[in-house]
Amino acid sequence: MRLYRRARRQDEKIDRIEAILASAKNLLATNTLDECNLTTIASDVGITKAALYRYFRVKELIFLEIYRRELAILAPALQEAFKTPHVEVLAATLTKQPIFCKLTAVLGDVLEKPLTEDEAAEFKLYVLQTFEPLCLQLNQQFDLSQPQVIALLMHITSAVVGCWKLSHPSPMMAAALQQHEALADFRLDFAAFLQQHLTMLLGQMLPSN
């Protein structure tokens, strides 16, 4: 545990926020969101749980900020992937960011839930702004309108959500699937399952060559 004095200057507050986000992201890498405990994060940063609330009023906002940063990395990577739109490349681009995929799977029903109306609007506007270069590229590349591009991205997001949840069952369910060979078809690999899903999806959504 690192011991920090109270952050007073703006640069100290920024450093504290970065430390909280780094600790939370490291914890999420090997745990589910439910298992990411604020007490553990605060202890790792060297502050009390009460002090942590000075920076983030609820746990979900910590991980929503991590999601925003992951999205900022993913958006230009998707631009590269769509330059030669092969499903394998697109699926690999997504699976290279497991933190993004894990958070996407709980975005609507967990992370966005405590947002105020203003926060919700600001967040979605951020998503739209982040995807704007990709939208322009897909508009020019495939002659898709903005609503069509947004629909495509929403379908891809839905694929990530569904494939992640189905390929990451509860510990009890995972044990049951391993124990019974008759249930082998329910043992899903996220990367392979996502690629299969995108193959079926993109054939319907993207213009043929």
Map each language-model feature to its residues.
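Hydrophobic alpha-helical connector segments
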Residues: 65, 79-103, 126, 152-156
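Basic, helix-initiating cap at the start of DNA-binding domains
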Residues: 1-31, 39-40
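Helical hydrophobic small-molecule/effector-binding pocket
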Residues: 87-119, 166-168
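Hydrophobic/aromatic-rich alpha-helical bundle segments in the mid-to-C-terminal region
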Residues: 128, 140-195
